[in-house]
């Protein structure tokens, strides 16, 4: 792998991220994993801590992957995570992963007694619905223990909004973190749960447009930075969150809340902050070349994740050609830096060792392309109604 190629292409994005990050702001990654997944991906403690260092992240929540040794009841993966977090000198906050079909209350109680400070549920991996009889028990356990539940709400699932919303509204004291910007049902979930005082949304997703829409629908105080390693990187996930937060017009205090302060307050027992109004419906206006570069480059990401390298390279080639287009315009500097990142990413895809840095560059290039133009409020759509103002939940701990 050509390390210098990666470093040179990365430099302007690092400088941009430093410019956007509020001084002295804590960075807290709400969604990370340790261990082994059935799909072959894995992450060990030193690597995760190194990735957090690269992002300047102080702390992170962590839980098991879909471990091949998860039977029975995720007990072995949960114990491993508890051991690793004990070795992290306080940087990692352990969540236990529960399977609703395998004694979830007994395993949850066992893990909470051993120091777990949250619960992870994955309805796609564990193939469950939120209308099952065991779900009220899990939510009641979290309410009583005053710990949050992080729920996979990303790709690969049928609609979950109605069952999850009904369940959450029966448990008004529970704190939920809906992962991946709740893209599986974002519109319905954000609408039905607007008045629930304890629903957060994490930013771990690939497409910036999903986050742009989330910031329009949800108060900034209910959005928390997350990166989902080993599938994402904390550093590039933070860059995406910073770019979209700035694009949404957030000030430094609000951005600081998104990237760390809200999660820090939750796990430290200081409660969730009161909410402001959502930013409201907006139009996303990109100049032609940026729109084309974004479109082609964003198609390369899923192809790379799926191992379809030639397909990804084809999309990268098209995006690079757009960035080389000499037409005049006010996005020249951005397109030059985006193009350099995509050229480097294309070269790095030629080796297996280069795929991870290639994805990092691609992720950042897509984030910048989608957020380079200033946001504009729609002239035809009214603002999305704000959630009811929520009082700080000083008794809520994780």
What are these regions (language model features)?
Residues 31, 52, 81, 85, ...:
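Conserved, mostly hydrophobic/aromatic
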Residues 51-55, 111, 142, 167, ...:
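Generic structural signal for hydrophobic
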Residues 4, 59, 72-148, 349, ...:
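Active-site gating/metal-coordination segments in enzymes
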Residues 1-26, 30, 43-50, 58-59, ...:
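Mid-to-C-terminal alpha-helical segments outside catalytic/metal-binding sites
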């Amino acid at each position: 792998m050509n390390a210098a190629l990666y470093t040179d292409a990365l430099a302007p994005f690092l400088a941009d991220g430093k410019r956007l990050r509020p001084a002295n702001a804590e960075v807290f990654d709400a969604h990370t994993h340790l261990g082994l997944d059935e799909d072959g991906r894995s992450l060990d403690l030193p690597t995760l801590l190194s990735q957090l260092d690269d992002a300047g992240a102080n702390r992170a929540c962590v839980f098991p992957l879909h471990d091949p040794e998860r039977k029975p009841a995720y007990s072995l993966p949960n114990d491993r995570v508890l051991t690793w977090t004990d070795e992290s000198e306080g940087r990692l906050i352990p969540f236990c992963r529960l399977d609703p079909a395998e004694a979830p209350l007994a395993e949850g109680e066992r893990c909470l007694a051993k120091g777990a400070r949250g619960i992870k549920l994955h309805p796609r991996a564990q193939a469950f619905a939120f209308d099952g009889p065991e779900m009220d028990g899990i939510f009641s356990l979290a309410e009583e223990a005053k710990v949050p539940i992080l729920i996979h709400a990303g790709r690969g699932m049928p609609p979950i909004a109605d069952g999850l919303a009904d369940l959450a509204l029966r448990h008004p004291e529970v704190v939920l973190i809906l992962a991946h910007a709740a893209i599986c049902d974002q519109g319905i979930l954000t609408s039905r749960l607007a008045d629930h005082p304890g629903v957060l949304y994490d930013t771990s997703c690939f497409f910036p447009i999903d986050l742009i829409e989330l910031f329009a629908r949800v108060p900034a105080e209910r959005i928390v930075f997350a990166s989902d390693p080993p599938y994402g990187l904390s550093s590039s996930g933070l860059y995406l969150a910073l770019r979209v937060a700035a694009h949404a017009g957030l000030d430094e205090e609000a951005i600081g809340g998104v990237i760390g302060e809200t999660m820090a307050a939750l796990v430290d027992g200081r409660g969730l902050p009161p909410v402001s109004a959502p930013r409201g419906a907006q139009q996303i206006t990109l100049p032609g070349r940026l729109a084309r570069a974004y479109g082609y480059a964003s198609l390369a990401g899923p192809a790379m994740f799926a191992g379809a390298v030639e397909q990804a390279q084809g999309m990268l080639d098209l995006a690079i050609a757009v960035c080389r287009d000499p037409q005049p315009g006010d996005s020249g500097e951005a397109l030059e830096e985006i193009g350099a990142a995509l050229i480097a990413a294309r070269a790095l895809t030629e080796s297996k060792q280069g795929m991870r840095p290639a994805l990092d560059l691609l992720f950042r290039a897509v984030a910048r392309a989608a957020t380079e133009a200033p946001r504009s409020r729609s002239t035809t759509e009214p603002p999305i109604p704000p959630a009811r103002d929520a009082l700080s939940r000083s008794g809520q701990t994780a």
